[in-house]
Regions:
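A domain-start/cap signature at the N-terminus of enzymes
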Residues: 41-79
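Short beta-strand/loop motif that positions the catalytic acidic residue
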Residues: 210-213, 217
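The conserved beta1-alpha1 loop
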Residues: 83-85, 190, 213, 317
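C-terminal catalytic histidine-bearing segment of alpha/beta-hydrolase fold enzymes
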Residues: 218, 222-313, 321
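Solvent-exposed alpha-helical segments and adjacent loops
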Residues: 316, 328-330, 334-562
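Primarily recognizes the serine-hydrolase "nucleophile elbow" in alpha/beta-hydrolase
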Residues: 158-205
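Gly/Ser-rich "nucleophile elbow"/oxyanion-hole loop immediately N-terminal to the catalytic nucleophile
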Residues: 69-75, 131-166, 177-182
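Active-site machinery of serine-nucleophile hydrolases
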Residues: 79, 83-151
């Protein structure tokens, strides 16, 4: 039972007992134990460390939690999700939000933490695997924590906020950009941006936002916040920016404790139905906000829609790089939608969906394509959730050969790093050990070809390409949907062959597996080392190779196209 329901039930029982005049300290009556339970519930205000089972690997993931001393269910409370910086953790981050510095910052003893002065906020600080950015797996960890807190406590869904420090606020901006309709505001401390976040700035149009940075910051130079301010203002997004002349990287010490950042944040409320929505999306995964959903885009290419609702309900929309979208009905109902200058009188009772034909825009659903949410790529999508690494057993002549195949899969599955103190690894299985339940719940990373891996052979008809058996000194890596999940197939040389981590793209703190693959679309063919790319790119909307890409791949004589 959620905490607030238990609390309310016990409190109501106490009031009934007190009103009856009954003596409530008798061991025999059971009230002795009962009042200990009541006391324990009241004692749960203040700081704590909780865990939640990860949706990615099932392991318990820690997060720090602060319950205000005024906590009194069933009253609903605002929730602040705070994301820690690089080389930090959930405990330290809660200390920073509460204004604790020095020796007490790493403890979670209730006496070491002051209350959030004048702020009745619940604060949750996810560990999110430590230092690996806030995209993919760590991103899911944050949403797991959000769901867990909402399950346990009475949260006002119109008062859920984001803040963070450095890497953490880079993650906060990413979360706010990709799901802007969830958040009521963002307080951003010296942002270190996540890859791909800059282009999504228009999505923050309806999310109250303030930036804070120290002019003397040498870890994340002040140019970062200045660039974000310009970027947001150029996109028409209201933003306030405070720059502190004599402050280094620890801008939060001033902004949280003395400059009212959290007071301002706690006063904001989510706007569920803004009159104007701007949405930029490069994937179906993040293709909706508020009352607008993009139905047809080219993954990897930014699609844009700027939709404005008039007082009579009619809508005007300007689009770029998209062929279909849907609006959610609201009062007053629109009678006309104008798209890129074309006025469309609406059909009564028909869905508010629109598609682009050769003749122009019209009302109606866009034709479904093979690429869709959960089946769109790129390569990194197969490494962003629950995953199993699978080596082949077909044709192995010796135990030593089988051991070498297993060793390759194990190397890929181990994401742990000394540099960022990340400890993360995934299940490794032989092809014959993979069950139907595995395929129903997980993406699979398959090593080998149809001749060496039975799962590659099993799914061959669904795979768009394959490496020829005689393609010595080549490596091929590609993603394809199989059922509800992805298969990531690595044939020939392992994808990290010859990788130079110092030149890898992506976010500095991401695991090597992520950074090495960040530049690639749905497939990459390389020769000798991953630095020697022969061809790479995206499959089309139906998971087929475009003609020019097919010509490049077949020219090498190493790839067979299905």
């Amino acid at each position: 039972m959620p905490y607030h329901r238990k609390h309310r039930r016990l409190r109501d029982i106490v009031r009934v007992v007190q009103a009856s005049g009954a003596r409530t300290y008798s061991r025999g009556s059971g009230f002795f134990a009962f009042f200990f339970a009541v006391a324990a519930l009241h004692a749960q205000t203040g700081p704590h460390v909780l865990t939640v089972a990860s949706a990615v690997d099932g392991r318990q993931q820690s997060y720090a939690l602060y319950i205000p001393r005024s906590f009194d269910p069933p009253k609903e409370y605002g929730l602040l999700i705070s994301l820690h910086s690089e080389d930090s953790n959930h405990r330290m981050n809660l200390s920073q939000v509460l204004g604790i510095v020095g020796r007490g910052a790493m403890t979670l003893e209730g006496t070491s933490f002051p209350p959030l002065r004048g702020r009745d906020l619940i604060v949750a600080c996810p560990l999110a695997r430590g230092t690996m950015g806030y995209q993919g797996i760590a991103e899911q960890d944050v949403y797991d924590v959000l769901a867990d807190v909402e399950r346990r406590y009475p949260v006002d869904r119109d008062r859920v906020y984001l803040t963070g420090i450095s890497m953490g606020v880079g993650g906060a901006l990413w979360l706010a950009e990709t799901r802007p309709d969830l958040w009521a505001g963002v307080a951003a401390m010296c942002p270190d941006s996540m890859p791909g976040s800059e282009d999504l700035a228009p999505n923050l149009l309806n999310v109250p936002l303030r930036l804070y940075h120290g002019e003397l910051d040498t870890i994340v130079p002040v140019a970062s916040s200045r660039a974000w301010q310009r970027r947001l203002l150029d996109a028409g997004v209201p933003v306030a920016y405070t720059e502190y002349p004599a402050t280094r990287h620890n801008v939060w010490d001033v902004a949280y404790s003395r400059d009212g950042a959290l007071e301002w944040l706690a006063a904001q409320r989510r706007n569920r139905w803004p009159d104007r929505v701007r949405l930029v999306a490069r994937s179906y995964q993040y293709s909706s906000a508020y009352w607008v959903r993009i139905d047809s885009l080219t993954p990897g290419v930014p699609a844009q829609i700027d939709a404005r609702r008039a007082s009579n309900g009619d809508v005007q929309a300007i689009t770029v790089n998209l062929d279909g979208f849907t609006l959610t009905a609201q009062e007053p109902q629109p009678s006309q939608v104008t798209v890129d200058g074309t006025a469309i009188r609406l059909k009564r009772g028909a869905p508010l969906s629109f598609n682009k034909s050769p003749a122009g825009w019209r009302q109606g659903l866009v034709a479904a394509a093979g690429k869709r949410i959960g089946a769109e790529g790129p390569i990194l999508r197969a490494l962003s959730g629950r995953q199993i690494y699978v080596y082949g057993t077909l044709g192995a002549q010796t135990d030593e050969e089988l051991a070498e195949r297993r060793k390759v899969a194990q190397a890929a599955s181990n994401w742990s790093t000394v540099r960022s103190h990340l400890q993360l690894s995934f299940a490794v299985k032989a092809d014959r050990e993979v069950t139907a339940a595995d395929l129903d719940s997980s993406d699979v990373v398959l090593f080998g070809t149809a001749k060496s891996n039975s799962l590659v052979a099993r799914f061959a008809a669904r795979l768009p390409i394959e490496l020829r058996p005689d393609a010595a000194d080549y490596g091929l890596l590609f993603i394809a949907p199989i059922g509800k999940h992805y298969a990531l197939v690595n044939s020939g040389l392992p994808w990290w062959t010859g990788a130079d981590e110092t030149s890898a793209s992506g976010y500095l703190w991401e695991p090597a597996q992520i950074r090495e693959l960040n530049p690639f679309g749905d497939y990459v063919l390389f020769r000798g080392t991953i630095a020697q790319v022969v061809a790479e790119g995206r499959f089309d909307a139906n998971w087929k190779l475009p003609a020019d890409a097919a010509a490049r791949l077949t020219a090498a004589g190493t790839v067979r196209i299905h």
